[in-house]
Amino acid sequence: MADSELAIALVGCGGMMGAHVRQGFQPLWEKGFRSFRIVACVDVNEAAAQKLADEIAAWQGTRPTVRGDVAALLAMDSVDAVDIVVPHHEHHTLAIACLEAGKHVLLEKPLAITLRAGRKILEAARRNKVVLSIAENYRRYPDQRAIRWAIRQGRIGQPQRVYWLDVFERRWYWGWRDHVELAGGGWTLDGGVHFADLMRYHVGEITEVTADMATFNPQRWRKVNEHEEPVTATIEDTTHALLRFENGAIGVWVEAITAPAKKIGTRVIYGTEGAIDLEAGLFLRGRDEPVSLKQLRDEFLASLTDDDREHLFPFGLMDGIAQEVHEFVVACQQGNLTVEVDGEEGYRSQAVCMAVYESATLRRPVKVARVMALKVEAYQHPINERWQIR
């Protein structure tokens, strides 16, 4: 391995790590970005680690070493950075072990199973002066960059209202994600941390949440088509939340994952002069046809300098995972601890989600700042106790 290459270990070789490899590391490598080398694959499931190592060897030319746990990984001298994709309840223990060993860390969202655990991760990163990047890919896609640009350009006027509704049905069992003590919460956290990040990215900071939650149908099936091997989920399946933004805007956020038959997928930001539908484009008062998302994206890309375009979309890659991986590698090599979605940014987005859970638990409005400061932990307390997060 060349001295200039960043030696990276992959911890957790399941589904989402496959996306990190196939949508991130591999296309960068194939574009000629050879500033890194994957040197280890780590998983308690050795077969998964071996399979991913074989896949990487096919395009990298060298096969990563396979290890069964992080302790064995940290005994290796040749690792500079670690990409961690594991169940939420393991984030803080594995990330902190790597950070304390002086390794840079790219950590899949959410930051941690609770904010108290997340704070411990932040403290370890600061203490050891290493890069901590949260794998938040949604905001990096061209459509989201274009939407933010259009809002900042004043195309919809002053943002005033947000309507974010995801209503659908999932009946199949999703493993650890269906258990609150392992996941920290349901789709309001797992997908919701993406959505909270996008709302903050487009509209601004969220300061207060009023929410309610329910579990209407906890039944899942390992064999969903046959209705065989039932499992009882312990996560919420329905969340309704009212949001108040720092700039005066208000929002409605709905997540429902067991609503039968009729789906609702609405993500719209209204301003004083128009609206942006995150799926359909820009709608303006007095104009019959919307500006399509493709047209908006083309306008945004045309507005960029060559340097800005290369910074946002290195090697012309438009995939958000490729961009976050590239940024992480460059930050580690340059000794620059600044990345777009660092631990603090990840903490802020997760705090919005946790404010929803806390408000629903307490049945009253909750200030996000108090949740961030760990002054409100009624929902999170049993999870902290389960994992002895103090």
Locate each region found by the language model.
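N-terminal Rossmann-like dinucleotide-binding module
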Residues: 1-59
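Beta-strand-loop-alpha-helix segment that lines the small-molecule cofactor/substrate pocket
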Residues: 2, 81, 87-139, 154
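Active-site loop of classical SDR/Rossmann-like NAD(P)-dependent oxidoreductases
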Residues: 16, 44-47, 314-325, 341
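Predominantly a Rossmann-like dinucleotide-binding segment in NAD(P)-dependent oxidoreductases
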Residues: 16-17, 138-233, 363
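Glycine- and charged-residue-rich phosphate/anionic-cofactor binding loop of Rossmann-like
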Residues: 34-40, 331-348
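Core-facing hydrophobic residues within beta-strands of well-ordered domains
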Residues: 36-38, 79, 159, 206
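Conserved SAM-binding strand-loop segment of SAM-dependent methyltransferases
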Residues: 63-70
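Contiguous beta-strand/loop segments that form the cofactor/metal-binding neighborhood of enzyme cores
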Residues: 197-290, 322-338, 353-356, 369-390
